[in-house]
């Protein structure tokens, strides 16, 4: 999915692989999947910044008694600055920080970002993308558009305007109304950390030559073999 973060207008999408099927299932819009670690900036780091944390705030990187989680390589450092936890997509600091700011704060902020959460999602798995029903690529793209445009949510849409044969306007999204979700300062601080994903983090191998991009990677483990993944996400701007 490619969309304009300043309007929510979808510029392009691939709905499925293989031959075109008329009115076939569109994975980009209708598929509900766990977003993996791409949820961390939404449910943990953005609300933490809003609560007064800074990119260089020190986070605990160690096992916790209230939720069983581990980092992707099975190691931990004890303490790490937030910007490193974001770039390296560390799981333990994300869970610890969600506990520090409070489940309600992370849950409510993620809903403000447009994620279709239910009460069943209000647990520590929210820090790692473990959702009851999941979300779609289109919703996640619009959520990251909030970081790209300075803090405002614009709902993703495919149609800009419809005028019927009588000249009546049926749909008009030429000037869509956005909703403020985070402050401009928070969006800028989040972007500064998401740049690290491609400069020295989990997205280094995907860093495009001669372009500067910010974003986040995400992987969901297979329930049958934890060494393999079901989905691999990349969201960038």
Segments from the language model and where they lie:
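Extracytoplasmic/periplasmic, Sec-exported soluble proteins
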Residues: 2, 30-39, 51, 74-78, ...
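Short, well-structured active-site flanking segments
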Residues: 25, 39, 48-67, 101-107, ...
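Glycine-rich, acidic and aromatic/proline-enriched surface loops and short helix-turn segments
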Residues: 2-19, 50-53, 78, 87-91, ...
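Flexible loop/turn segments at secondary-structure boundaries
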Residues: 9-11, 18-21, 66-67, 93-94, ...
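Conserved catalytic neighborhood of penicillin-recognizing serine enzymes
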Residues: 53-106, 167-196
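Mid-domain, small-residue-enriched loop/turn segments at the edges of structured enzyme/sensor domains
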Residues: 70-71, 102-142
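A penicillin-recognizing enzyme superfamily signal
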Residues: 1-4, 13-14, 20-29, 136-142, ...
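Active-site SXXK
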Residues: 8, 34-59, 85, 143-147, ...
């Amino acid at each position: 999915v490619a969309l304009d973060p300043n309007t929510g207008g979808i510029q392009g999408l691939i709905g499925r692989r293989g031959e075109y099927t008329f009115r076939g299932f569109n994975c980009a819009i209708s598929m509900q999947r766990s977003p993996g670690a791409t949820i961390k900036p939404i449910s943990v780091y953005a609300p933490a910044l809003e609560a007064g944390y800074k990119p260089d705030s020190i986070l605990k990187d160690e096992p916790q008694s209230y939720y069983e989680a581990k980092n992707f390589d099975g190691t931990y450092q004890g303490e790490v600055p937030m910007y490193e936890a974001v770039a390296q997509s560390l799981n333990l600091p994300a869970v610890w920080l969600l506990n520090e700011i409070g489940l309600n704060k992370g849950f409510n902020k993620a809903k403000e970002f447009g994620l279709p959460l239910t009460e069943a999602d209000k647990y520590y798995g929210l820090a790692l993308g473990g959702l009851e029903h999941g979300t779609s690529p289109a919703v996640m793209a619009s959520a990251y558009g909030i970081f790209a445009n300075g803090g405002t949510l614009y709902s993703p849409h495919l149609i800009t305007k419809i005028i019927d044969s009588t000249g009546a306007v049926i749909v008009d999204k030429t000037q869509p109304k956005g909703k403020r979700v985070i402050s401009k300062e928070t969006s800028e601080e989040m972007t500064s950390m998401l740049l690290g994903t491609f400069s020295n983090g989990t997205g280094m191998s995907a860093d495009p030559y001669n372009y500067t991009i910010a974003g986040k990677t995400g992987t969901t483990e297979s329930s049958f073999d934890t060494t393999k993944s079901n989905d691999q996400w990349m969201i960038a701007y």
